[in-house]
UniProtKB/Swiss-Prot annotation:
Any one cellular-component term (Gene Ontology): virion component
Transmembrane intervals: none
Annotated family: Belongs to the eukaryotic RPB7/RPC8 RNA polymerase subunit family.
Lineage: Viruses, Varidnaviria, Bamfordvirae, Nucleocytoviricota, Megaviricetes
SUPFAM superfamilies, A to Z: N-terminal, heterodimerisation domain of RBP7 (RpoE), Nucleic acid-binding proteins
Organism expressing this protein natively: Acanthamoeba polyphaga mimivirus
The protein, known as: Putative DNA-directed RNA polymerase subunit L376
Length: 199
């Protein structure tokens, strides 16, 4: 099944360290705290983890014989809200800037660069260095909402943003703008209504 949304709930697995002083009665709280410090708001191999909702399970933990500090490594399965752009995914973005040859837009932690030569020519035209929407002859400008299709993704582990290259498809409809606003609330609140899971 193809991914249909930029934001979704999923289950992931990671290794989490606990110091000997954290291996006490509320160990699960320390596991959650250390897990969040490791993955929250950072680029991982799966995307950006926006919120760790809960720990599903964890193993007994392993202390390496070469580890003289007594730190144990636990394999933790957890449920989280993730932001994961993929190729050919259509998303709504807010135009933040227009620089020579590019529209720079954003959706949450995803920065979108749209080259002027990568626009839907049925809906837009390049006139005097501006991209003009053919339906109303207005120039694309800062503050506009646009619909794009992701072409390429650049990530660096542990960074807070994902950079993408996209094709400009259309101006966003009112319903799409409302959906974009809901996504921005989702980023802040960390809750999601649907139960989509991509594992």
């Amino acid at each position: 099944m193809a991914q249909q949304s930029l934001y979704f709930q999923t289950k992931l697995e990671d290794k989490v360290s606990l110091l000997p002083s954290q291996m006490v009665g509320n160990m699960e709280n320390y596991l959650l705290e250390n897990l969040e410090a490791k993955v929250k708001d950072k680029v991982t191999e799966h995307g950006i983890v926006l919120k760790v909702n809960r720990i599903i399970e964890y193993d007994y933990g392993i202390i390496s014989k070469n580890n003289f500090s007594g730190t144990a490594i636990y394999r933790v399965k957890y449920e989280c809200l993730i932001c994961s752009p993929v190729k050919n995914l259509s998303i709504i973005c807010l135009v933040e800037n227009i620089v020579k040859g590019y529209i720079i837009a954003k959706n949450g932690p995803v920065i979108v660069a749209i080259p002027f030569n990568n626009i839907d020519s049925d809906k837009f035209q390049l006139t005097n260095g501006n991209i003009v929407y053919k339906n109303n002859s207005n120039n694309i400008q800062k503050g506009d909402y646009v619909k794009v299709s992701i072409i390429n993704i650049k990530t660096n582990l542990n960074e807070k943003k994902i950079t993408t290259i996209a094709k400009l498809l259309d101006m966003a409809t009112n319903d799409e703008i409302k959906s974009y606003d809901n996504d921005q609330l989702l980023i802040v609140n960390g809750d999601v209504d649907d139960e989509q899971e991509f594992i």
